[in-house]
Amino acid sequence: LTERPNAQAFFYEGSTYREFGILMVHGFGGSPAELRPLGLHFAERGYTVDCPLLPRHGGPPSEMRGAKWQEWVEAAAKSLHELRQSCSKVLVCGLSMGGLVTLQLARRQAEFGQIDGIVLMGTPVALRNRLAGLARLAKHVVSDFGPLDRADFRQPHVQKFVLRNAPPDAVIDFSDKQVIAAIRKQARIPLDAVDQLLQLNKLAVRELPHVRVPALIAQGRHDHVVSPHSAQAIYERIGSTDKQLLWLPHSAHVLPLEPDHAELFAAVRQFVGQVAG
């Protein structure tokens, strides 16, 4: 899990629709790799696409120690500002925690710049892992927690998660106890970083009624990280009058890489057309 394939930021200058910019924001502990297929989809159709690597991401989870949620928002805001220099319209797509960052950008447009629409994918209002809810208290007792500590490595979705974060040519023996122990150790996340995620989550929930840009909210029915109730809660609380809720019946958490990705891409394409006018 130390080497992260395709973790680097990516930027594609548009052609046919070069003045329509799409900013993509990855998730907590993730990297631009999880959004690259969606980015390529729109780059191939002539749109300008930018996906920054958020601070303290792209390497092992231990590098997230000491992170502040403001760093993540400011990094995305910088990319938004740069897109605005050449694009007359900008759509922001956020995956998981990236959706929380997206909501902050949409809420603070006077500070960060105009946004013409947002796409929220698997955005966490309600987390499935109850340990995360104890982060603010537990961080004073222990320094980190392991999301894979109790994972069953025989389960396909667990193996899929591990392989996504491994080098492309990695061969992993999921029956080897020493290999599993090493994976669990490397996957441990600093609790102070989880606390920052929860702070950002709390702020986003509180400010949802003040977000009024057109919004597409997408959620996988088989999400093992974020409760599907999150999508419904966002849809009901967000201040946008132009809003859509897309359920993906065969998808888990990282929507651009899930079985329903073609349906997601088509929905975002249609939404882009609506925003473009």
Q: Where are the regions a protein language model picked out?
A:
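Short beta-strand/loop motif that positions the catalytic acidic residue
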Residues: 211, 217-219, 223
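Catalytic nucleophile-loop/oxyanion-hole region of alpha/beta-hydrolase
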Residues: 60-91
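Conserved alpha/beta-hydrolase "acid-adjacent" motif
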Residues: 224-230
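Conserved alpha/beta-hydrolase
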Residues: 42-61
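Alpha/beta-hydrolase-fold enzymes
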Residues: 97, 101-104, 108-187
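The serine-hydrolase catalytic nucleophile loop
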Residues: 29-39
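Catalytic active-site module of serine/aspartate enzymes centered on a nucleophile-bearing elbow/loop
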Residues: 244-277
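Active-site nucleophile elbow and catalytic-triad environment of alpha/beta-hydrolase enzymes
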Residues: 7, 190-207
